[in-house]
Amino acid sequence: MVHLTPEEKTVVSALWGKVNVDAVGGEALGRLLVVYPWTQRFFESFGDLSSPAAVMGNPKVKAHGKKVLGAFSDGLAHLDSLKGTFSQLSELHCDKLHVDPENFRLLGNVLVCVLAHNFGKEFTPQVQAAYQKVVAGVANALAHKYH
């Protein structure tokens, strides 16, 4: 559960309505893989991840980034029940994929950077504060099934 004020909910929804999920998802996941290269071990089947240019241009990275942000969009529609919304994804990432839950926090912070880059002055400190709450809540929900 994420505790947002009505004003925070408004700014999150307003900005998210302008987000190009395809582009932002690919950029966020790509940046995660470049900035934190140890996360690439979960994506070995994606092919060439040998350089920043290869990662950022990789169609599988872009496609998976779109998928990740699609799930994030679902979470935005269910801010009061994030653990339930992400229960199956948490179980998958914990039990089958064995993803370090810290990676969820890293990806959330990268997403905030990408949003700031894409929206410039529109991404005010108020908007950032609201999004930091959201990505922290999503990361916590995704880590919920970990023992």
Curated annotation (Swiss-Prot):
PROSITE patterns named in the record: GLOBIN
Chain residues that bind heme b: 64, 93
An example of a GO molecular function for this protein is: oxygen binding
The family line of this record is: Belongs to the globin family.
A Gene Ontology biological process in which this protein takes part is: hydrogen peroxide catabolic process
Keywords of this entry: Heme, Iron, Metal-binding, Oxygen transport, Phosphoprotein, Transport
Which species does this protein come from?
Answer: Colobus polykomos
List the PANTHER family.
Answer: HEMOGLOBIN FAMILY MEMBER, HEMOGLOBIN SUBUNIT BETA
Record's subunit section:
Heterotetramer of two delta chains and two alpha chains.
Q: Under what name is this protein listed?
A: Hemoglobin subunit delta
Task: Give the sites modified to Phosphoserine.
Answer: 51
Gene3D superfamilies named in the record: Globins
Iron among the record's keywords? yes
